[in-house]
Structures are given as C-alpha cells and as structure tokens.
Amino acid sequence: LGFDRCQVAVVTNIGAGDHLGLNYITTVEDLAVLKRVIVQNVATTGYAVLNAADPIVAAMAPACPGKIIFFASDRHHPVMATHRAQGHRTVYVDGDSIVASEGSWRETIHLRDVPITRNGKIGFQVENVMAAVAAAWGVDMPWQTIRRGLSGFVNDSDNAPGRFNIMDYRGATVIADY
C-alpha cells in the first residue's frame, strides 16, 4: 500500500472474480485476500464501506479496525437488517431513492437526480452510487456536496473511457463498455 491508514476503504464486490488472471490473482480467495488489505488498514476513526449482499465482502467486516457502513439494494438483507437494528450506518434503495440511515436519522437522494443510474434502471450503477454515497458520508462530506456531485457526474469517454459510456447517436442509444 502507498499509505499506512485510510479514513475510508471501499470494497464493492468480489462476485465471481471478474479480474482473475491479472497480476497472479487466480482464485476468488486470492482476490478477497487482496481486497481485504485496504479494510485492514482503515484508521480506528474511519470506515470500511462494504457490500452486504456479497458474502465474501461482508465477511471482511471483522478485519476492520474502524467502523462499517454496509450498502445493498435490499435493506431487508439479513446483514443490512442486523446492522440497521444496531443503529449503525447503512445505505440502501427504498423505492425510487437511495437512503443513508443511522439509527433513526435518514437522508434520501432520489435516483432521478443521479443521471448515471438512468432513474435507477442501471442496477450496477445504483450499487456504485450507494458505495460512493457511503464513502463520502464516511469522511463527513456535506450532503449538499454529495448531491451536487451525483447530479453533475457524467459517465462519458472523457472521464471514464470504456466504462459503460452511454451516448445517443442518430436516435439510437450506444453503450461503450469493455
């Protein structure tokens, strides 16, 4: 690592190991060990942002010296429900909104105000936005700043080339993704 401790670490998923075969990472277990390193290096005052719906990622929670913010589309997922019941920070989808909650406190961000999700229709982008919201919250970024960033972010070839860039061309929608 290029740092000793971090205030926020984010692990979005391990899944089926989409990046296997790169840099001697050949198994899902190898990938989990590698991604867990940043969780282990969270400052005691910091947060690990973990996907509650990915069991390998959720299992990283005990390795974090700081606190955990779990995120998942399903707020009723057992990991999410337990974490919420304990009054801890969670980020989830409720209808047409992303909700950040801690105890009885809630902040809501409407998906219609987050262009990258296309009104919540692009599920993996909703997941990415939940992780981004949790990370920004973990460093106490003001909610107005978080909203402004989400509403103004455009996933185009200038800032994220080849990463699910959506373009309209002559009446057709074109997606560039590698």
Regions found by a protein language model. Name each.
Residues 1-79, 117:
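Flexible active-site lid/hinge loop adjacent to a nucleotide/diphosphate
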Residues 24-32, 36, 65-178:
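Adenine nucleotide phosphate-binding catalytic loops in nucleotide-utilizing enzymes
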